[in-house]
Amino acid sequence: MTIIVGIDPGSRVTGYGIIRQQGRHLTYLGSGCIRTVVDDMPTRLKLIYAGVSEIITQFQPDCMAIEQVFMAKNPDSALKLGQARGVAIVAGVNQDLPVFEYAARLVKKTVVGTGAADKKQVQHMVRSLLKLSASPQADAADALAIAITHCHFNQSLLRTAAVKVNPLAG
């Protein structure tokens, strides 16, 4: 059994989603958004760090999966996103979590089937895959999709490792 916290970083809204993986079975544990309403960036980063740290303390995940930085059209936006990612990663590393990074297009392709999926499609598939009664908020759905992607690739790695080390495998 593995508990994964997925993080969709943002300087104004950081989504998080927590799922438990037991073999191929995924269980939804929680999700939400850390919203920073202040204007100065250092305070926003402090709030993101504190929020992610609190979530980790509450749910005790085994690892963190986070979205990789993509190059935004606006360099200032890319820098702010990188800073938000950085404090989220530090929150995980400070609590001894291994951190795994996934590109947004890979997450969309894994969860929806196409790397060009929109937010509504991601929300719909996350709701379906986790058997939720309602769609999560967009940023929380993205974070859950990142965690689901980690489960998918983690399961693939486990199967590959079993084939390589199992002397009974043909």
From Swiss-Prot:
What is this enzyme's EC? 3.1.21.10
Q: Which GO terms describe its molecular function?
A: crossover junction DNA endonuclease activity; DNA binding; magnesium ion binding
Q: Which Gene3D superfamilies match?
A: Ribonuclease H-like superfamily/Ribonuclease H (3.30.420.10)
Q: Which GO terms describe its cellular component?
A: cytoplasm; Holliday junction resolvase complex
> Keyword Cell division, does the record have it?
no
Q: What does this protein do, in the record's words? A: The RuvA-RuvB-RuvC complex processes Holliday junction (HJ) DNA during genetic recombination and DNA repair. Endonuclease that resolves HJ intermediates. Cleaves cruciform DNA by making single-stranded nicks across the HJ at symmetrical positions within the homologous arms, yielding a 5'-phosphate and a 3'-hydroxyl group; requires a central core of homology in the junction. The consensus cleavage sequence is 5'-(A/T)TT(C/G)-3'. Cleavage occurs on the 3'-side of the TT dinucleotide at the point of strand exchange.
Q: Which family does it belong to?
A: Belongs to the RuvC family.
What is the recorded name of this protein? Crossover junction endodeoxyribonuclease RuvC
According to its UniProt entry, this protein's organism is Pectobacterium atrosepticum (strain SCRI 1043 / ATCC BAA-672)
This protein's gene is called ruvC
